């Protein structure tokens, strides 16, 4: 899996967690070093922040994450399914 250290300006990243649970694409338009993090700007106008060796970042005011590649999206979805399947109602 890619980390945000591997991501460059112009690369495609994947947004998951929007209201309809779709996976959308955006690109990195700015990437600035901030100690152990990257401050990011995306082509959709939002800004975010990621750990340098992380596979996901936050995005603006949205309750969604931006993943470095599609494998990271799949891993996150599978982990959430595992957590939800263990909840007893």
What label would you give each PLM region?
Residues 39-89:
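Intrinsically disordered, low-complexity, charged/polar segments
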Residues 18-19:
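Short, surface-exposed secondary-structure boundary micro-motifs
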Residues 22-33:
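Short beta-strand-centered aromatic/proline hotspots
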Residues 35-37:
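Short, internal acidic amphipathic alpha-helical interface segments
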């Amino acid at each position: 899996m890619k980390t945000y250290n591997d991501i460059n300006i112009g690369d495609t990243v994947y947004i998951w967690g929007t209201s309809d649970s779709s996976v959308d694409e955006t690109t990195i338009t700015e990437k600035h070093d901030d100690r152990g993090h990257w401050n990011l700007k995306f082509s959709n106008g939002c800004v975010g922040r990621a750990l340098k060796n992380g596979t996901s970042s936050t995005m603006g005011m949205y309750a969604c994450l931006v993943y470095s590649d599609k494998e990271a999206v799949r891993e996150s979805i599978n982990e959430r399914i595992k957590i939800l399947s263990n909840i007893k109602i």
